[in-house]
Amino acid sequence: MATRGNVPAHMQASLPALPAHLQSDTHITAHLASRFHVSLPTARLSSQGLICLNTFTSSTRGPNGDKEGSAMGEAEDLARRAWARLGNRAEDQAFVFFGESGSGKTTVRSHLLSSFLSFSSTPLSSKLSLAAFVFDTLTTTKTTTTQTASKAGLFYELQYDASSNNPTLIGGKLLDHRLERSRISHVPTGERSFHVLYYLLAGTSAAEKSHLGLDGHVNITTAGTGLSRSASVSHKRWRYLGHPTQMKVGINDAEGFQHFKNALRKLEFPRTEIAEICQVLAAILHIGQLEFGTGQATLTAAEESGGYSHEGGETVTVVKNRDTLAIVAAFLGLGVQDLEESLRYKTRTIHRERVTVMLDTKGARENADELATTLYSLLVTYIIESINQRVCAAEDSVANTISIVDFPGFADHSSTGSVLDQLLNNAANESLYNTCLHSIFEKTAEMLESEEVSVPATSYFDNSDAVRGLLKHGNGLLAILDDQTRRGRTDVQFLESLRKRFENKNKAITVGSATSTMPGSNFATTNLAASFTVRHYAGEVDYPVHSLVEENGDVVSGDLMNMIKATKSDFVANLFGQEALNTVSHPAEKTAIVQAQVSSKPLRMPSVSRKKHDQLRRMASRRADRSPAPQEEEPLPGTEEAKVRRTKPTATGLTQGAAAQFLSALDNITKSLTAPNVNNYFVFCLKPNDRRIANQFDSKCVRQQVQMFGIAEISQRLRTADFTIFLPFGEFLGLTDADGGVVGSDREKAQLVLDSKHWPPNEARIGNTGVFLSERCWASIALTGSQAAAYFGGDIGSPSRPDTPGHNPFSDSKARLVGSADGTPGSFYGDEAKGGGYFGSRELDAKSDAGASAFHSGDMFRNLETKEELAEKGNKKKVEEVDVVPVSSSRKRWLAIVYFLTWYLPDFAIKWIGGMKRKDVRTAWREKFAINLLIWLSCGLVVFFIIVFPELICPKQNVYSAAELSAHDGKGKHSAYVAIRGQVFDLGAFMPNHYPKIIPQSSLKKYAGVDATGLFPVQVSALCQGKDGRVDPTVQLDYTATNISGTAAVISSTDANRKYHDFRYFTNDSRPDWFYEQMIMLKANYRKGSIGYTPQYVKTLAKKSKSIAILNDRVYDFTTYNEGGRSVRAPPGEEVPSGVDTDFMDSLVVDLFTQRAGHDVTKYWNALPLDPGLRSRMQLCLDNLFFVGVTDTRNSPRCLFARYILLAVSILLCSVIGFKFFAALQFGGKNVPENLDKFVICQVPAYTEDEDSLRRAIDSAARMRYDDKRKLLIVVCDGMIIGQGNDRPTPRIVLDILGVSETVDPEPLSFESLGEGMKQHNMGKVYSGLYEVQGHIVPFMVVVKVGKPSEVSRPGNRGKRDSQMVIMRFLHRVHYNLPMSPLELEMHHQIRNIIGVNPTFYEFMLQIDADTVVAPDSATRMVSAFLRDTRLIGVCGETSLSNAKSSFITMMQVYEYYISHNLTKAFESLFGSVTCLPGCFTMYRIRAAETGKPLFVSKEIIQDYSEIRVDTLHMKNLLHLGEDRYLTTLLLKYHSKYKTKYIFHAHAWTIAPDSWKVFMSQRRRWINSTVHNLIELIPLQQLCGFCCFSMRFVVFLDLLSTVVAPVTVAYIAYLIVLLATESDVVPLTAFILLGAIYGLQAIIFILRRKWEMIGWMIVYILAMPVFSLGLPLYAFWHMDDFSWGNTRLVRGEHGKQILLSDEGKFGPDSIPKKKWEEYQAELWDAQTQRDDARSELSGYSYGTKSYLPTGSVYGGGYNDTQHLMMAPSRSASQLDMHPTPMYGGGGGHNQSRMSLAPSEMLGSQSNLMMPSGRSVADMEMSDLTGLPTDDMLLNEIRDILRTADLMTVTKKGIKQELERRFNVNLDMKRAYIGSATEAILSGQL
């Protein structure tokens, strides 16, 4: 590099000062490199620009170790120069930063700001520095290129007043632009989210972490990884914080948090508000931890009746980690349930309809991310606006401003995946770069041209095409994007709009194809990778359009807004109450927020300077004359105009998308930068390499950036024209103190001055009215003294002089700024020396500092509400008194029983341990517990009766008869028992222990099963004390076994082994106690029982001269004693002593057994005159010598009773089943019913079923073989909800199936619903038409419950019972002629005037579920049953499973469904009292056939079934668990003379639950509702039958069987045990009976040839424990599992209860009602008025009160109207081929006509759907016999029209002429007259 003189070339800091041959990209790069390598990483573009290279080390040290030559030094120098211009010229100063991410923009910006603030060392300057730090903390992040990447556009404004040369800082303003919100939920790999989140996690104390839930005690598993984290926070993976390694990237987060809190405190944020900010930040982190899974909504909601076709509950998304959810809810001041609801649902606007989408787990995760993103965006906006409110000065006091503009760097790809963020930031960079080019090239050129000064032109890259293409209002790319968003267009439509606008019109924008052709295919498909390309100044970028339109909408769902309305946190309410949140209200109800949008532009605008220079203003006005018309001014935020603009309605409800808002904010910046009194400086930040290596210069990398920013062209331009100041001649001459003595014009004088100054021509030129100067030249004449010294302390680059260090005159007064050296707040730029950060002087705010220190040293949440208190507060509902209800006496009695049973459970324990805060919930739990106690007591009683009671009556005896003993002979698998002296022992167990061991066991086993007493002779004297206490040892007593069976195997006294056990006195080995000892041992170890003798057999033995009798249930035998068994024997060698008394037993005892042989001698024994000693001695002798067994009472009467009681129970159960079997044997052919003419309604309630299920149900109902014109298909859609797996809301699916066009949009009408408080007011839409399927043309009506405008989540949804009540209440009011709601009047109008049937004609209603398929002959068979039996009020058919083989769960249910219908319902049908008519397939009689009295829709049924106050456990089980069964109960209760029956010939197929959870929930509903409904039925007196044959007895048995179902399993298990252990015939008989049960069932399905049921029966039997044990126990304990809603009861005065609700109080008057006659009169009047003006028959709708042409019922006639419509199911040509009208009955009409006139079917009603061709008028009026026939009227109308003036004739005039001719009132023929007139005039007749 060349040198100039002795000064090295690299010392030249100003690039324009380089020679011309060095003004290229390559040479400039080389020059920057030479400076970089000598630690001079900066350069200048004269006075207008600064170039800084990031050294990745310190930005505060230059080549000499001080700041001179560093980025910090250059920033300070630039600030001094701008400060001088601000003070001396009163110009606004603006600094625009350019640079890619990682170029160090944020650091240089902080140095620049610190320099300006140091000029005004006041507390305000400190606050403004802290404000910038807070902004960076909230909006910067660490990326792969830098640790301080800015992710929001910044416009920082310093405000000054007007004061001579030293402006006073009076305020500041932070304007944030488009925060990169997507980073919150999608942290790129290797990057971080916003710093403040890491600060919070690292900087909080242990107590604060505990409060915020950030400690390790919350067990959280990272979604998708399955890795559970340990208790340490540092090892827990936070989803919103990226990879855990990002928490250790060299940033001191803990210190950053302390700085952040200090900054907020010094900015005057209250302590409580800082705590609230931290709680919201913690809530955001916890939202990221929420894990979602798929579950079942098994708890019935408070306003729902549950089931629909989903009998056990619908599939919903649930939060798995509810502890984390509770933390989020607590910090947001919300209820846990409310928060979960809002996360699982999302409401959208589709075709102007609000629709709630039931989200899957992915959708719920995205919804949670949206909540987190919205929270963070609003929090940032709130903090910034709060700062602005504290530091911003009043607009009218601001004289000048210094603005710093810093937007995120240009990006060629989106790291977070947000294309919109990338597009908007790049557009901002494009606009700011264009402003730079315009300022340097165009603005100067315009000024010079206006002064007729010519300079050489400089070529440069002009990005105007890109700027116009992107930013032009009206038809720029961003404007088009916003327009397409507001119109609700798709991405493809947006792309096509871009094509039309830019193709071949703007070379900067290229639009890709919206379609693509796959290889091997000739058909174009949608291009999923469709994109457009923008040629930016920094290069071409492709922008995919996928989801771009939706992302631009930036919509916050109405569910979230509706949820936040209920927050108990004032801070959160303030967040969502900001002006930054643009809300969209429902057009019909302004208080209902449909959706919202977080603003992408700041809440404030740049200040408008009040001080202008006249010359500049003049020049600006000249330029304006040549410029296009200005764009419309954006209204100031917060003004009324802005509010009005925000509320303009659009297709999507949005007024502006993110693009339009950003574009508006960008316009404000551009206007601010290009204002006449603004001097701009441009700072270009470059990164020396892409790898963030310190002190390494990559020439290629830098050259690309130099080329990108056009630095060479800018430098060349400044070499020819470096003019930034224009001075009029007078001002210029005044500054230069030109000699007044010089004669000449001012121009000449100025020229002389210029000549004398020797300024180069590129820095000083003279114009027509003034002088153009560079900033350096101006400073040399304008600044004096210290100002000049300060300014020239750093030279700006004279061509002849290199930079020299200068003195800083502000160093004495400037406050040194403190920072940190570790890359944390204060300075984010390598290891900064203390001095260049955000934080101002410690001395300036010592008081605030001390307060902050005290604040962050402890627990910021001390003395604030705890997390638990916040949770309780959030769950508490705001309630108001809505009703006072009395407490019934029965309820009081029941509660008394409940508290008697649960008194030992204190209320506080239930409250705190059970978590039940509400009194009514605790009461319900007590009721549940009491009911369970009663159930368990009942089960215990049954167990006692079955098992314990028989044992009490007949205690178990361990006795063995001879036969039983013989069976234990040890052969085969039999055990080996042996009897010795009446005792039975286990020989098998004894044999291994026999002594001596040498005796083989085979020798011992021969004694098995026999009485071996003979083997064991006894020593009498050892076992008996005799009469006087001693028996001579020589006395012997032989033992002769009692023949107890006649064939007993008895061991004789001659047995060979006897001698081995003979140890009597006379033997050689006398052991008198041996036998006694052996017996003690045997009894202790081997005894099994005793030999048993029945009393009858004892008597038999006595008859055989046996001296045997019973004493105390023990049998003693004196036969041997009496018959010579006594003897006297002495040992060998000894003489037998004489006089030995062998009568050792008392004679009284002997006589007693001899004389009373065969009897029980107990009472005689007790009467013997024996002294106690003798009696005791005799008893001892009896037991040891004469005992042979015990009394066997097993066949006694009481034991037989105990035994057969089990059999009796089995017989009783089997008898009931037997009756059911005979009831099921309904043989006979399927009688084909006669042609029926009754009108039938088929109602299908729809909720979230899929299209296939709905189509099957609707098609099956339409295809039923029943007269189509007498069927009416009514589908009631419960809410605007998109079910999981569906792509459209359920009503739209139904309407698409029925062929209704999307253009048909009736007005929603009010009606009453079942709900809490204001939810009783609902709104619905009515559609009607004809549905054609497989040759059937069926009229239909669809009622869609859409909800009031104020309903955001699940609008209109009220549950299945409410869907039933819509039709039932309507028919009730029709039959009772009661005033109707608008919706009901519209339904009446549709059915009567459009479909053509009087609603009173419908006699029967068939209710099916939306997933039920009915057999074609179902309706005919049910109607036939009604006609055969006029006392029948309801019938059900057999329902089978259509998904029988889906899973084992469904397989278990197949057989159960079958027997529940063919046994239970068939049996109940015998009594005419089927206790449960299933809602999935039942037909009801609407009115009595003879009298027309309403039955199904009677007053009592409607009143009880529409009960809204469902606040007790009993009522909830009735109405929320089993509404179908309760409806049947009401029918039996109020219409006891009518019957309910089961018809097995009518078939339907439904879907059963296929998962355990849904199945258990379904059965919980069924079991509990069964119990509560049977309790309702038992007290009824009207149930038929008498005694045990009454239905009440059967109901009681059903209730008992339901309650004690678990015992049945125990009973069967008990029988199995009995059968296994006893060979008795009784349990075997019981099993035979139980087998007969299934045998009878088998007979049923065999006779009906249901062979497959054999297999299903086996599956059912295997599942018996589940059905009879598991499910009942689960159901009983979960009897109180409900979503209790927000209505509750509290105890009031005088025994009354007050009903409280947070849904508001419903006023019935809010829904207008009107009788049909009044409404019909209005129709006629309106029609007559229009008839006078128009010759056209009209239809008139309550919903619109508008004139609508009536269409044909054949279809197509209503497709173009707003309200009335028919499905265009068939074409006209198809219809005209029918020889007779479809609904015609032939009565009086010309049958030769091919088709009817358009209104003939609707207007006359003369033959539409009437029995036997009769008209509505024929059926209703009795005075029409004198009216002329239709043919007579037709002939007269033709005659009148033949002579009438067709220009003046009206239908009213024709009617009046006909009345004159026939002399009769023809009001009832008005419609026919009109339709006939129309037909004649149109040529159809």
UniProtKB/Swiss-Prot annotation:
Keyword list, A-Z = Actin-binding, ATP-binding, Cell membrane, Glycoprotein, Glycosyltransferase, Membrane, Motor protein, Myosin, Nucleotide-binding, Transferase, Transmembrane, Transmembrane helix, Virulence, Zymogen
Where it mainly occurs, coarsely classed, is membrane
UniProt PTM comment: Maximal activity requires trypsin activation, suggesting a zymogenic nature.
Q: Which reaction does it catalyse?
A: [(1->4)-N-acetyl-beta-D-glucosaminyl](n) + UDP-N-acetyl-alpha-D-glucosamine = [(1->4)-N-acetyl-beta-D-glucosaminyl](n+1) + UDP + H(+)
Q: Which CDD domains match?
A: MYSc_Myo17
Give the compositionally biased regions (Basic residues): 609-621
Q: What does induction of this protein depend on? A: The expression level increases quickly and almost doubles when cells were shifted to 37 degrees Celsius, compared to cells maintained at 25 degrees Celsius. Expression is also increased under additional stress conditions that are known to initiate development of the sclerotic morphology (acidic conditions or Ca(2+) limitation induced by EGTA) or of hyphae (induced by nitrogen limitation). At least one negative regulator binding sequence exists in the promoter between -880 and -680 bp and another regulatory binding site is localized between bp -680 and -450 bp.
Record membrane topology: Multi-pass membrane protein
Residues carrying a glycan: 219, 429, 668, 1043, 1068, 1462, 1568, 1759, 1790
Q: Which Pfam families match?
A: Chitin_synth_2, Cyt-b5, DEK_C, Myosin_head
In this chain the Cytochrome b5 heme-binding domain maps to 957-1016
Give the stretches traversing the membrane.
Answer: 894-914, 929-949, 1205-1225, 1599-1619, 1626-1646, 1653-1673
User: Which stretches make up the Myosin motor domain?
Assistant: 1-789
| GO biological process terms on file | chitin biosynthetic process; fungal-type cell wall organization
- Enzyme Commission designation: 2.4.1.16
Show the segment(s) annotated as Disordered.
Answer: 601-649, 794-817
Q: Where does ATP bind?
A: 99-106
Q: Where in the cell is it found?
A: Cell membrane; Membrane
This chain's function reads:
Polymerizes chitin, a structural polymer of the cell wall and septum, by transferring the sugar moiety of UDP-GlcNAc to the non-reducing end of the growing chitin polymer. CHS5 is required for the sustained growth at 37 degrees Celsius and is of critical importance for virulence. Especially important at infection temperatures for maintaining the cell wall integrity of developing yeast buds, elongating tips of hyphae, and random sites of expansion in sclerotic forms.
Free-text note on domains in this protein's UniProt record: Contains an N-terminal myosin motor-like domain with a P-loop (MMD) that is involved in the actin-dependent localization to the regions of cell wall growth.
| Family statement drawn from the similarity comment of this UniProt entry | In the N-terminal section; belongs to the TRAFAC class myosin-kinesin ATPase superfamily. Myosin family. In the C-terminal section; belongs to the chitin synthase family. Class V subfamily.
Query: What's the protein called, per UniProt?
Result: Chitin synthase 5
What is the taxonomic lineage of the source species? Eukaryota, Fungi, Dikarya, Ascomycota, Pezizomycotina
